[in-house]
Every structure is written in C-alpha cells, then in structure tokens.
Curated annotation (Swiss-Prot):
Antimicrobial peptide. One of its GO terms (cellular component) is extracellular region. Coiled coil: none annotated. It is found in: Secreted. Belongs to the gastrin/cholecystokinin family. Magainin subfamily. The modification Leucine amide is found at L21. The keyword Secreted applies. This is Peptide PGLa-R3. The keyword Secreted applies. Expressed by the skin glands. Keywords: Amidation, Amphibian defense peptide, Antimicrobial, Secreted. It comes from Xenopus ruwenzoriensis (Uganda clawed frog). It comes from the Eukaryota. Its main location: secreted.
Amino acid sequence: GMASKAGTIVGKIAKVALNAL
C-alpha cells in the first residue's frame, strides 16, 4: 500500500544520505 511505498522511499533517501556522508 501507500505506507509500504512511503517506507521504501524513505529507506532509499536514507541510504543515499548515508552514502553522501
């Protein structure tokens, strides 16, 4: 559902942010 999609998006952003560090 939308909740799972939102969670996936947040996870992707978090991974990108950590990689940027």
